[in-house]
Swiss-Prot record:
Main location: membrane
SUPFAM superfamilies recorded: L domain-like (SSF52058), Toll/Interleukin receptor TIR domain (SSF52200)
Start-end of each LRR repeat: 240-263, 264-286, 288-309, 313-334, 337-358, 362-383, 386-407, 410-433, 434-455, 458-479
Molecular-function annotations in GO: NAD+ nucleosidase activity, cyclic ADP-ribose generating
Keyword NAD: yes
Protein name: Toll-like receptor 11
Native organism: Mus musculus (Mouse)
Single biological process term from Gene Ontology: innate immune response
Lineage: Eukaryota, Metazoa, Chordata, Craniata, Vertebrata
Length: 926
């Protein structure tokens, strides 16, 4: 193949390769990760209802949860860098150095990797990390070795937790000064002295005079729960340790053992499930103790040796799930500061018998739930004048009168759920003017009159529930913000005029039948933002909803519908201009017309951002179902069987939402869905979850559980459409680019093409030096010929070491006799590695010198990196007289100019400089 044709072929091949790489890059990038889920809790907080993943923390939104992790680096490589919550589950014995350095925004890290070793630089770069958890959920503890300085770089760490790990082989671990919560649950602690070995900065020296260590962390909470070998605390084991909270749930350690431990300033102590049988009196030594949790123990009597332990600073006391049957007289007198008392799940029934002396001016919260109470006697709570919350759920109370609640004028929350209440007596809330929250779920009420809810002036949250039917009569409280109504059979609103719920923001209805009487009356919800409907299909019919919601819901943002039966649903969304989240569950769309129904349902809510579809029996999906959802950011399919993905859904890929989840979805085995795999793994802007483990079935009786991707790889042609698209795209792009390169108006494109051509020329492996006959072409005029031949040429052509040994091309010497000078000049300059122009006033006046300078300038611009131009000034000249001087000034470097005028440079120095520049030009050309 001729040389010119070979160069053109290489150039075209270069274009094809570059375009192929660009195309593969554009279509191949994705952040879909096997066994990982990426979620934005700010976008859809209810996602965990459909897909379980690790818990987050308040204020954190972008979450990544990965399971079956074996290669940590490979898994983390595709997790978004701005992840705030990262949960990892799998098998990674050793955490390498800088394992999480990419995640500068990470604030919560939960590791369930069965890790046995952590290096000193594992967590380097996590300056924002606040929560760090090491979890091992197994009956036996796992040994974990921690380098002493492994947490040194975590300057913002506030919570550190170890669950199911033994730190036996670790010691002298540095804890950041920002640490506030330390947890060692279900570990191998046998005594408190182990803490001093593990974390010496926590404890002061055991000398009699405590010296606070500068920079030591100040713990608010120390959780040592379920350390089954921790049975006693030795003398001064915790000497000098200052804590707000100490949690010892599930340990055999008795509270009495803490007396001589040296623990200072304890505010909260939890001894849940420790097996104690009486309220410890020895803790009164902690005069600042404010909270004590003694739940799930064996306490039958609060009395101890006939006296009640006195906790003068105690504000919270929990005795839930014990065996209490009575409360001693003057019980609250010994707790003058008590504000919250939890006595739930005891045996204080059937009648609440409170001692006559039981009163408190500070008690604000009282929980008497699940105590088998049948009645609250008149005035039983009248002495609790400051009570704000009263919890009586799960008892057997059948009725309450205003005398039962007399004296509770500060009460704000009243919970009477899951009782046997059948009738509400008139005025029973008359003594509760401050009530804002009332819970009557799970009762046996048959009707509720609005007049029965009178008394509270600012009732905002109301929950009503009945097993059979529930009739609701006006007037309802005008200040309601949240209303939840449940009835097993029917909810019936009996109204006489279109009285609106002016301020209601959250409405939940759960029933089989929803009725509104009289039929021609409507209810208005102008402020409704969240609507939840649960029940049988006919409650969701268009006719029912239009009667109940006849006008627009202008502020509705979240609509949740969950059906309880398998009948078809006739549903139509209307008048919801601000709907952002739509959740549909168990609405049986018949597969024959499923696409049409879903399309009709969604076309009225084009502003939708989150769409969750569960148990809908969709059977078939096509692009027409979602083409109206331009703002969709999250799409979830849950529990669908034999789902067919129409191939025209590929048209929807450019506007596919940012998150697409498939949870427990079974597809049909058909090649029409072959595009799913390439889309799921190469989706440029979409995270896809659940497809890699989805199965497909050939028919209704197929139980083979064939993986969808395995079926597509085995039975369907792979990638034919993609490569066809890629080929046509490249050809079309070539037809566009090639004319532009030759267009004179697009000179920058021509220069870019030249640069690519040069790089490819070198990549093709050409030995450029072998293609040149001369090292330097010298351009000069006749007046300067004598100086060139006598002074310049001998220095450059002389053999080393005296000279450089360059091959020079001189027009007067090397042009063939009888050859055309123009052709010889063009050919010679093209075969020379560099061009040296000797410039004087006579040279600038010479047509041939000007022509040679122009030709050399052209080669310099058209072939950058492969040709060089050197200018030698023998006399002072105005450089503006040079042809295309401004272009030359951009392309030439400082070392490309040589000035011998007026003896500015010594001859020897000039020769050395010229030799070095010519030698460097030769190396660059090679």
């Amino acid at each position: 193949m001729p040389r010119m044709e070979r160069h053109q072929f290489c150039s075209v091949l270069l274009i094809l390769i570059l375009l192929t790489l660009v195309s593969l890059t554009l279509t191949g990038w994705a952040w879909t990760i096997p066994d990982c889920i990426i979620a934005d809790s700010l976008l859809f907080p209810n996602l965990s209802y459909y897909i379980p993943f690790c818990t987050s923390a308040p204020g954190l939104h972008l979450l990544a949860s990965c399971s079956n992790v074996k290669n940590l680096n490979q898994t983390l490589k595709r997790v978004p860098r701005n992840t705030e919550v990262l949960c990892l589950q799998g098998m990674v014995p050793t955490l390498p150095a800088k394992a999480f350095i990419r995640f500068h925004s990470l604030q919560l890290l939960r590791l369930q990797l069965r890790t046995t070793s952590v290096t000193s630089r594992t967590f380097q770069g996590l300056d924002q990390l606040q929560y760090l958890f090491f979890d091992h959920h197994a009956p036996c503890c796992l040994s974990l070795f921690l380098s002493p300085n492994c947490f040194e770089s975590l300057r913002s760490l506030s919570s550190l937790s170890f669950q199911g790990y033994c730190l036996t082989y670790s010691q002298s671990i540095y804890l950041p000064t920002s640490l506030r919560h330390l947890t060692l649950r279900n570990s191998c602690l046998t005594k408190f002295q182990d803490l001093q070995r593990l974390f010496p900065d926590l404890l002061l020296s055991t000398s009699s005079t405590p010296n606070i260590k500068p920079g030591a962390p100040f713990l608010e909470t120390l959780d040592l729960s379920y350390n089954l070998q921790l049975k006693q605390a030795g003398v001064r084991d915790l000497y000098g340790l200052t804590l707000h909270s100490l949690i010892l749930d599930g340990t055999p350690l008795k509270a009495l053992d803490l007396t001589d431990s040296g623990l200072l300033h304890l505010h909260f102590l939890s001894l849940v499930g420790t097996g104690i049988e009486k309220v410890p009196a020895s803790l009164t030594g902690y005069s600042e103790l404010r909270a004590l949790d003694l739940g799930k123990n064996q306490i039958q009597n609060i009395l101890e040796n006939g006296e009640i332990p006195g906790y003068k600073a105690l504000e919270f006391l929990s005795l839930h799930d014990n065996h209490l049957q009575t409360l001693p007289t003057r019980f609250l007198h010994t707790l003058p500061q008590l504000q919250k008392l939890n006595l739930s799940m005891n045996k204080l029934g059937p009648i609440l018998e409170l001692p006559e002396g039981l009163f408190s001016t500070n008690l604000k919260v009282l929980d008497l739930s699940y105590n088998q109470l049948c009645d609250v006697p008149h005035g039983a709570l009248s002495l609790l004048s400051q009570l704000q919350e009263l919890w009586l759920s799960g008892n057997n109370i059948s009725s309450l009168s205003n005398e039962s609640l007399q004296g509770l004028r500060q009460l704000r929350t009243l919970d009477l759920s899951w009782n046997q209440i059948k009738v509400l007596k008139p005025g029973w809330l008359s003594h509760l003017p401050a009530l804002t929250t009332l819970n009557l779920l799970g009762t046996y009420l048959e009707y509720i009159l609005g007049i029965q809810l009178q008394g509270p002036k600012m009732l905002r949250h109301l929950q009503l529930g009945s097993y059979p039917i529930l009739d609701i009569y006006p007037p309802w409280p005008p200040t309601l913000l949240s209303l939840e109504i449940q009835a097993e059979s029917c909810i019936q609103f009996m109204i006489h005029s279109g009285q609106p719920f002016l301020f209601l923001e959250n409405l939940t209805l759960e029933t089989s039948i929803l009725l509104l009487k009289p039929d021609n009356i409507t209810i208005h919800f102008p402020s409704l933002r969240r609507l939840t409907l649960r029940g049988y299909s006919f409650i969701f019919s268009t006719s029912q909803l239009q009667r109940f919601f006849p006008q627009q819901l202008p502020l509705l943002e979240h609509f949740f519908i969950w059906c309880e039966n398998s009948y078809a649903v006739d549903l139509y969304l209307f008048g919801m201009p601000r709907l952002r989240v739509l959740e549909l569950g168990y609405l049986n769309f018949f597969y024959e017309s499923s696409t049409m129904k879903l399309e009709m349902l969604l076309k009225e809510v084009p502003q939708l951002q989150v769409l969750a579809l569960s148990h809908l029996n969709l059977r078939n999906l096509s692009v027409s179902s979602f083409k109206s959802l331009q703002d969709l950011k999250l799409l979830l399919f849950n529990s669908e069987r034999a789902l067919e993905m129409n191939s025209n859904l590929q048209e929807f890929i450019p506007q596919m939402p940012q998150y697409v989840y498939f949870s427990d979805v079974t597809f049909t085995c058909q090649c029409e869905a072959s595009w799913l795999e390439s889309w799921a793994t190469r989706a440029p802007n979409t995270f896809v979850y659940g497809l890699e483990k989805s199965i497909c079935i050939a028919n209704a009786s197929d139980y083979s559980k064939t993986l969808l991707f395995s079926f597509l790889a085995t039975n369907c042609p792979h990638g034919t459409e993609f490569w066809g698209f890629l080929t046509s795209f490249i050809l079309l792009l070539l037809l566009i680019i090639l004319p532009l390169i030759s267009c004179p108006k697009w000179s920058w494109l021509h220069h870019l093409w030249t640069l690519f051509h040069t790089c490819w020329w070198k990549l093709c492996g050409h030995r450029l030096r072998g293609q040149f006959n001369y090292d330097v072409f010298i351009s000069y005029c006749e007046e300067d010929q004598a100086w060139v031949l006598e002074e310049l040429v001998p220095v450059l052509e002389k053999a080393p070491p005296e000279g450089e040994g360059l091959r020079l091309c001189l027009p007067a010497r090397d042009f063939g006799i009888g050859n055309d000078r123009m052709e010889s000049m063009i050919a010679s300059m093209g075969k020379s590695r560099a061009t040296l122009c000797v410039l004087t006033g006579q040279a600038l006046a010479s047509p041939w010198c000007n022509l040679e300078l122009r030709l050399a300038t052209y080669h310099l611009v058209a072939r950058p990196g492969t040709t060089h131009l050197l200018l030698l000034f023998l006399e002072p000249l105005d450089r503006q007289r040079l042809h295309s001087y401004h272009r030359l000034s951009r392309w030439l470097q400082k070392e490309d100019y040589f000035d011998l005028s007026q003896g500015k440079v010594e001859w020897n120095s000039f020769c050395e400089q010229l030799k070095r520049r010519l030698s460097k030009a030769g190396q660059e050309r090679d």
